[in-house]
Amino acid sequence: MVDKIGETNTLCPVCMKTIKAEKIAEDDVVYIVKTCPEHGSWKVKIWNGVEHYKYLYEFAAVPKTPEKFAVPQIKDCPHDCGLCNQHMQHSCLNVVEVTNHCNLNCPICFATANGCGYDYHPDMETIRGMFKTVVDYVKSPRCIQLSGGEPTVRDDLPEIVRMAKEMGIEHVEVNTNAVRIAKDIEYLRALKEAGVDDFYMQFDGTKDDIYLQTRGKSLFELKEQAIANCAEVGIGITLVVTVSPNINLDHVGEIIKYAATKVPTVKGVHFQPIS
């Protein structure tokens, strides 16, 4: 039995035009069914478990529109680039890149740090301008993630955090590989005193053979030290796992069990799969 459970907009995978689609339930699986007048029809699986899919929609929040819009609507979403008036929701977490420098050279790197071919290490006034954009466009609560590269290579990161707080940004998260906060607890204390609320910490498993493949060196002991330091200082952590099918996919359960032993310092685990 096939039931229609909703409608949405999607893209033709051939011409990339925006087309209408139906969400259907069939054999306890949710699919999107779409047809492009020029290129035909597709049926795409999007979720296992119809009731679970519906249950998740109970958590949908009332959207908060942006304070203002940055660009005019020219075409339609997602073909325009920028914050146009089609955006019903303001930015929930604004990623602010403060460097492309890094103290690791990971075989797997989402930012291509140390290998992007140019140097990016903005001064304080440039960063102030980025923070002002967040304040101008985002309704409270304003949340940012300082990212890179590796933000903690900056000795002035506590000053950057303090500036964000003074400008009205309520929540400051730092994306980190944990190298510096494991080795330099006084630097960690300075970040805490400046106003860092939590760390988004790279964590690929509990065995060094995993890190040798994902990060190029043994790092598990360092990760444990970083967690211990954060527990001492009083800063929460989200463990961020790059999941590779050939490296640590079968280690996901062990990571969750490990994280549970580090509560309340570890607040959660975020899985980022790669193919």
Predicted segments, located by residue:
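Short, flexible, mixed-charge glycine/proline-rich loop motifs
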Residues: 1-7, 24-29, 99
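Acidic, low-complexity/disordered tracts enriched in E/D and polar residues
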Residues: 2, 8-9, 17-20, 37, ...
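Short recognition patches in nucleic-acid-associated and regulatory proteins
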Residues: 11, 16-29
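A short, sequence-level motif marking secondary-structure junctions
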Residues: 25, 47-52
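Conserved alpha-helical substructure of the radical SAM core
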Residues: 28-43, 47, 63-176, 180-186, ...
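Short, surface-exposed linear segments at secondary-structure transitions and domain or protein termini
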Residues: 50-60
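Radical SAM/AdoMet-radical enzyme domain recognition
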Residues: 128-145, 154-273
